[in-house]
A protein has these predicted regions:
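Hydrophobic/tyrosine-rich beta-strand signature of extracellular beta-sandwich/beta-rich modules
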Residues: 54-56
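Short acidic/polar micro-motifs centered on Gly/Asp/Asn
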Residues: 15-34
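C-terminal edge strands of extracellular/lumenal beta-sandwich accessory domains
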Residues: 60, 123-134, 159-190
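Acidic, Ser/Thr/Pro-rich low-complexity intrinsically disordered segments
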Residues: 88-148
Length: 190
């Protein structure tokens, strides 16, 4: 009896409890011994809705699982200063795990027409286009006075694919400052 108890204690020390996670993005499970750590950090590379399985294994080898829904959204800030030919801002709204598509993306775009000369500055006409594989899906234009700032805020529902934001100077001074702020957003219900 005494030997059996001692052997059991040795087994439990060598094979203690452990815990881990299955990230839900195709990676292998991440497991650690509870003696070595009390938490596991997971980093996701791509936006999406992930079903993460957290699990614990006791000293007798019994496993308990709990599924946790994790929502990873993406925020991108794109800047160009003193440009006469703004570059295309390209992003992919496809989820990184082949899961449900985003609810929408929100674009806040700011264009500044800096005042080069305090008197006799020029206006600039700009046009924004949101382009997907089917062509232009949204567009807007604005005349921005010398030293002024123009804004465009738009939503695009159910986006799934690569999108491009084109900003074109249609008329006026050559140099502008650009800031695109983009959020890829998922709904709570998936």
């Amino acid at each position: 009896q005494l030997q059996s108890s001692a052997a059991s204690d040795v087994y439990k020390r060598q094979h203690g409890s452990s815990f881990g996670v299955v990230p839900g993005d195709g990676r292998e499970p991440i497991t650690t011994d509870s003696v070595d750590a009390t938490e596991i950090a997971i980093e996701f590379t791509f936006h999406g809705l992930y079903s993460v399985t957290a699990f614990g294994i006791d000293q007798e080898g019994h496993r308990e699982d709990q599924v946790i829904e994790v929502m990873i959204e993406q925020h991108i800030d794109w800047y160009e200063n003193d440009t006469g030919t703004p570059e295309e801002f390209v992003f992919d709204s496809t989820p990184g795990n082949e899961g449900p598509i985003p609810s929408h993306f929100l674009l806040n775009s700011t264009v500044q027409n800096p005042s080069i000369i305090d008197f006799d500055g020029r206006d600039v006409d700009v046009r924004w286009d949101v382009v997907n594989q089917e062509g232009v899906c949204q567009t807007a234009g604005e005349n921005i006075g010398n030293g002024d700032t123009g804004f465009w805020k738009t939503l695009h529902f159910g986006p799934l694919s690569v999108h491009e934001i084109h900003l074109v100077i249609e008329d006026g001074q050559d140099r502008i400052d650009v800031h695109h702020s983009l959020e890829i957003i998922y709904s709570e219900s998936g």
